[in-house]
Amino acid sequence: MKFGNICFSYQPPGETHKLSNGSLCSAWYRLRRVGFDTYWTLEHHFTEFGLTGNLFVAAANLLGRTKTLNVGTMGVVIPTAHPVRQLEDVLLLDQMSKGRFNFGTVRGLYHKDFRVFGVDMEESRAITQNFYQMIMESLQTGTISSDSDYIQFPKVDVYPKVYSKNVPTCMTAESASTTEWLAIQGLPMVLSWIIGTNEKKAQMELYNEIATEYGHDISKIDHCMTYICSVDDDAQKAQDVCREFLKNWYDSYVNATNIFNDSNQTRGYDYHKGQWRDFVLQGHTNTNRRVDYSNGINPVGTPEQCIEIIQRDIDATGITNITCGFEANGTEDEIIASMRRFMTQVAPFLKEPK
């Protein structure tokens, strides 16, 4: 079993950037004693939904503060930056951390990112796959070049050379298309905290069928499940503290992108639009009902309730790499306290899949 901690870097109403970032930096430093294997950061731009615009800089800070903690990006919005610059950042962090950096990526969902950085959002899937493959191959060969439809440049050597034999990597996968592509490559997925057990199980069944067909040993692919987490002996308190945070956080998420607007005609995001339509039909676009839904499928409650929820997903998917976000717990001290309860009262009692 592996346990990670994910930082959303959300700016709650009434907090300054200085306070939000200061609290997170302090929590980052303190969590090294809590016992997590990996700490993950998320990339966002132009929104209070997430204040971390450059994950390589954030990862360098965290890696420099610690000696044994692994640090990952979950993930770099890969189509919005030059692949060689990203590759150089990955190589430098891999070398300077002596192999403690995990390169996680996402395709991107926020229209402002693509407009500001000059990328066609409708081509984001193809660009992501092209850049990602290019970077992964270059980590093995030490050279990079491209004559694709999306970027062209001559062959060059890249430095520094890799420290790790295989730089750890993953990609957030929500749609069937992304799941299928990652399965063909035999690359690890990150499963979202906004889907329930049955959807996670179906996603893994699809992945495993395709990956096996393409000759990959699925027992050696290290997928990750993510959660919103609040552990407290008082279940109602855990629910309430998450509600206070999530009702603003989820509204911020919806407002950060126009992909959910009925008038939006952006192609290539059918899964996300369909998921939102399902939420509308189920009443989950109402803030309180959306939070109720989130609390119901995530480990929010007593240690026993949290164990039950995570174990159910472990048994359904076979995934034993668990990553939780604790920012919904309130103050820095409350966040650390919930982390400690998780690592002492939940994590030790989770079992390998049946």
From Swiss-Prot:
InterPro entries: Alkanal_monooxygenase, Bact_Lucif_Oxidored, Bacterial_luciferase_CS, Luciferase-like_dom, Luciferase-like_sf, Luciferase_bac/NFP
SUPFAM superfamilies for the chain: Bacterial luciferase-like
PROSITE patterns: BACTERIAL_LUCIFERASE
Keyword entries, A-Z: Flavoprotein, FMN, Luminescence, Monooxygenase, Oxidoreductase, Photoprotein
GO cellular component, one term: cytosol
Enzyme Commission (EC) number: 1.14.14.3
Signal peptide boundaries: none
Any one GO molecular-function label of the UniProt entry: alkanal monooxygenase (FMN-linked) activity
Family annotation (Gene3D superfamilies): Luciferase-like domain
Pfam families xrefs: Bac_luciferase
GO biological process, any: bioluminescence
Top EC group: oxidoreductase
Protein function: Light-emitting reaction in luminous bacteria.
Subunit structure: Heterodimer of an alpha and a beta chain.
Family listed: Belongs to the bacterial luciferase oxidoreductase family.
Name of the protein in its database record: Alkanal monooxygenase alpha chain
Source organism of this protein record: Aliivibrio fischeri (Vibrio fischeri)
Gene that encodes it: luxA
